[in-house]
Amino acid sequence: MIKALIFDFDGLILDTETHEYEVLQEIFEEHGSVLPLSVWGKVIGTAAGFRPFEYLEEQIGKKLNHEELTQLRRERFAKRMESEKARPGVEAYLNAAKDLGLKIGLASSSDYKWVSGHLKQIGLFDDFEVIQTADDVEEVKPNPELYLLAAKNLGVSPAECLAFEDSVNGSIAAKRAGMKCVIVPNKVTGTLMFEDYDHRLESMAEMELALLLDHLNSQN
């Protein structure tokens, strides 16, 4: 029986990932190159040491000013995020979870400052009883440590948790932790190949939480 929901953050609650990829793609195109999604997709949802501007240098065969490009990336990303809201259905799921008496947690490979800042900006920070980030663990996703820690601090077993993820690395982490996992891919991650999950939604607005839980609980 599912007693807790644990949400990813980037790309799942707030679609930072699509904007991040599109900003990088703009910069790559301005330098006569492209950033293939097949390359970028491998690092979504984790903290892999991929350095996009080093990759760009390799593609075009010349040195670039990383500091200037990083600043440009930040400015363009911030501009895009000014009016960004939670993905469709997120707030409804959080409210429904509270009505159903479920515990609510968050597990993100990003750092706490990033996650908490964005959650406060969209007014959802107080909805989470537990927020686990990269600051709390030795290894982020696809390692299951973030999910296991979130479950522990919510006072439930991993088997009693339902994880919501948008990335391949995130879904791997949730399943390795022994949780059920619903994937809700975004514009970017929707093109990636997911292997192990329990249900797929294109949006949380697609199905009411109570119906989703009934469906998943019936699989036991």
Swiss-Prot record:
It comes from the Bacteria. Transmembrane segments: none annotated. It is an enzyme of class 3 (hydrolase). Keywords: Hydrolase, Metal-binding. A divalent metal cation binds at residues 8, 10, 166. InterPro entries: HAD-like_sf, HAD-SF_hydro_IA, HAD_2, HAD_sf, PGP-like_dom2. Pfam families: HAD_2. Its cofactor is a divalent metal cation. CDD domains: HAD_BPGM-like. Belongs to the HAD-like hydrolase superfamily. CbbY/CbbZ/Gph/YieH family. This is Putative phosphatase YhcW. The gene is yhcW.
